[in-house]
Amino acid sequence: EQLSSERVLFSVATDYHQQLETYGSLIRQIHQARVSAPPLMGWWSWTAYYFGLNEGAALTNAQWEAEHLKSLGYNIFHIDEGYQYARGEYITPNATLFPRGLAPLEYKVRGLGLTPAIWTAPFEISERSWVYQNHPDWLVKNAKGQPIHAGTVVDNKDQLFVLDTTNPEAQGYLRKTYSTLVNDWGIHSIKMDFMDDSLIEGYYHEPNTTALEAQRIGLKIIRDAVGDNVYLDKDGSAMLNPVGYVDYGRISQDTGHTFDASKEAAPGIAARYYMNRNFFVADPDAFTVSTQTIDDQSWHESNKPATLDDAKVSIALAAVSGGMFEIGDALPTLSKAPERLALIQNQDLINMIRLGKASIPLDLMNFAPEDEQPSIFFLKEDDRQSILTVFNWTDKERERSINLTTTGLPASGEYAISDVLDNQKIAAVASGVLAFHQPPHSVRVFKIVDAHVSATAPAVRTEHPSAGNAGSTLTFVAHSQGGDAVLSYHWDFGDGITIEGSDVKHTYTEPGEFKVQVTAAGLSGLSAEDHFQLRISGYMPTTFEPQKIKRFEPEK
């Protein structure tokens, strides 16, 4: 007798963290996960304006981000739902809010040095959309041949249906939509929402197609349409199905402007920590730190201003994910709140994101009964420095103590501990136990430095050509080889051009000998350099040669 199944992993061990991380690593290898994308930092519009963002408010927030936050690494400018005419019609703007369309606005956003990003729900089709009005035959159907109803947008408004991704004409429409977003609007990062709601079984154009198969077919069409250099962020969907097509993936439910919203999002971030850099780069949803209220939204009583502790909980929760780091506030509201703006500017939190590693929920399976969910997260940033993040999910003040050996730190260490959010040094740890007071609805983020371990500069190795031709695009790659953890790489190409990144491209326009230098900035403040000589030969041709001219054709 034989049993046929998909690939199965069976493993027994006492260390459940190791088991989860092993599973994540195997998923990365088997499914060729896209995990090399940078941890995006920036702003998104949803929790700031919900359906109400208009052209003027968008530009104001873009200008504010560019002026106050871009230098810190916040460069993503994400417009969420509301810009489009209807779900399923994403290249037709909502003329009430964006009377000149989105392309002129995104042009200005790029001019500010920001990266345009946008929201879509790729497989949902509204009854108001062009597809529903003109091609109901492109939709997933029931046994009677009728389009299957799949819900509403909100409050029973706008009935929704599902695009049949196996229908060749629907595929063409999907391809055109995403190609336009990228090639005409200049979008570089695309969120794909509600893929769980549109995951319905039904009658597809291609018989015997399952909902999961249809979703993979649609994702491949989108990836092929946008190319490899555009970031795709899966939102609501099964965790595993989009792996290999998406760069980022939501690991929690929606957040908002309240402590309760953060508390409800936290279990997902804890339980899925091992997915970061294994399935995709984690998307913990946006954090909010302002006192902004949303009077016409009832989401978790968001009409009440968040306390400073609420704000700290929200941003710390995003930081422990080690993934995306997006601000969900109306940015101008931070101009008169320096203590809240300081949270966004906090270098230790930013470094947690730049390192790209998720904090481990130490109490994932044995959290305190009063917390009702994991509350202790630990990030070993390098051999010398670690971050311990502790949430108080309860309504009561607490006196807490944590034995540092439970984090994996050696008992022999001599630890200097500081409070990251309050910029205060903590008194010496007694017998390896960190004791502290914690108010209700709060978080403490401790930086732990082992004085027995000396700070060392990072070691860096480069992959690069030794020669090239003027006008040709060359690739340069930097790798960390031990020492201090690397936060950033800075390239100087010797021709007046500098670029940030571990994997970069550059084109020289003139021949000559150039000294190329890369500087790796380490976590402890030390840096390392590598340099090499590069010979560029020849000149860029300037003659008219029509036989060499090729007609540009957008990807289909």
Predicted regions and their residues:
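Beta-strand-rich recognition/accessory modules
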Residues: 1-37, 305, 433, 438
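Aromatic-lined carbohydrate-binding/catalytic grooves of carbohydrate-active enzymes
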Residues: 39-179, 185-205
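Active-site-proximal helices and loops of the catalytic beta/alpha 8
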Residues: 103-106, 110, 114-117, 206-264, ...
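Glycan-recognition surfaces
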Residues: 133-172, 217-334
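Carbohydrate-binding surface patches
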Residues: 314, 318-321, 326, 367-410, ...
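Solvent-exposed beta-strand/loop surfaces of large extracellular or lumenal domains
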Residues: 414-433
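C-terminal beta-strand-rich structural cap/linker in extracellular carbohydrate-active enzymes
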Residues: 429-456
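Extracellular/lumenal mature domains of secreted and surface-exposed proteins
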Residues: 450-556
